[in-house]
Curated annotation (Swiss-Prot):
Gene name for this UniProt entry: pabC
Annotated positions of the N6-(pyridoxal phosphate)lysine modification: 140
Protein known as: Aminodeoxychorismate lyase
One record GO biological process: tetrahydrofolate biosynthetic process
Matches recorded under PROSITE patterns: AA_TRANSFER_CLASS_4
Species this protein is from: Escherichia coli (strain K12)
Cofactor: pyridoxal 5'-phosphate
Family matches, as Pfam families: Aminotran_4 (PF01063)
Name of the top EC class for this enzyme: lyase
Length: 269
């Protein structure tokens, strides 16, 4: 089911800048028992992204209500919200563009997540590296060609997810998830000021770890440094947290961090 600017429809104007330039942002939320998990965080993410992309929006109360309505109809599943700058403007220029377009859709919850949660995730190093751009770093914008290529290469392997470096070789994230690793009592996660997506569940885990006995450090780390970990986990708003059992030839057997985070992230407030 799709809602475009509050109307049930599945067609979008070809002049919309989402199709012309990927000019917009999106978020993907989990629906549990008819409610959007971490609803306020998802709306805040969209607001922050629109501000950084200089997209003017005045429909936030309507959007929140539409998200709640679709979630109630789906009960359990996935809610995706896309915001584009709308139509207009000549070429790349944003002058005379808008109003912004909002697109909501609901789909079923990924059936394979339960199996992966039980068996653990295997990671493969991606040959595709992320470009560094502080103007876009952290935003879940509509330009996802890097992730499309990462996924295409991943599907030629037997791994479940990809470990992705940036163009300078620093560990950044996975194809569709953020990454944490633990060495002793210290938990590390990559800095995302140059590349990567600052995920909703990553933010939630950081808040949890700040209140825990673990020491959290946001780092610029090499692949070799990250693979010296005692344990790895990945997370996104849908998973929400999964243990990594192997990355390439390196195996992980500890699940201490996962066992701490998993129950707290399953139904986050």
């Amino acid at each position: 089911m799709f809602l475009i600017n509050g109307h049930k429809q599945e067609s979008l104007a070809v002049s919309d800048r989402a199709t012309q330039f990927g000019d917009g942002c999106f978020t993907t939320a989990r629906v549990i028992d008819g409610k959007v998990s971490l609803l306020s965080a998802h709306i805040q993410r969209l607001q922050d992204a629109c501000q950084r992309l200089m997209i003017s929006c005045d429909f936030w109360p309507q959007l929140e209500q539409e998200m709640k309505t679709l979630a109630a109809e789906q009960q359990n599943g996935v809610l995706k919200v896309v915001i584009s700058r709308g139509s207009g403007g000549r070429g790349y220029s944003t002058l005379n563009s808008g109003p912004a377009t909002r697109i909501l859709s609901v789909t079923a919850y990924p059936a394979h997540y339960d199996r992966l949660r039980n068996e653990g995730i295997t990671l493969a190093l991606s040959p595709v590296r992320l470009g560094r751009n502080p103007h876009l770093a952290g935003i879940k914008h509509l330009n996802r060609l890097e992730q499309v290529l990462i996924r295409s290469h991943l599907e030629q392997t037997n791994a479940d997810e990809a470990l992705v470096l940036d163009s300078e070789g620093w560990v950044t994230e996975c194809c569709a998830a953020n990454l944490f690793w633990r060495k002793g009592n210290v938990v590390y996660t990559p800095r995302l000021d140059q590349a990567g997506v600052n995920g909703i569940m990553r933010q939630f885990c950081i808040r949890l770890l700040a209140q825990s006995s673990y020491q959290l450090v946001e780092v610029q780390a090499s692949l070799e440094e990250s693979l010296q970990a005692d344990e790895m986990v990945i997370c996104n708003a849908l998973m929400p947290v999964m243990p990594v059992c192997a990355c390439g030839d390196v195996s992980f057997s500890s699940a201490t961090l996962y066992e701490y985070l998993a129950p707290l992230c399953e139904r986050p407030n």
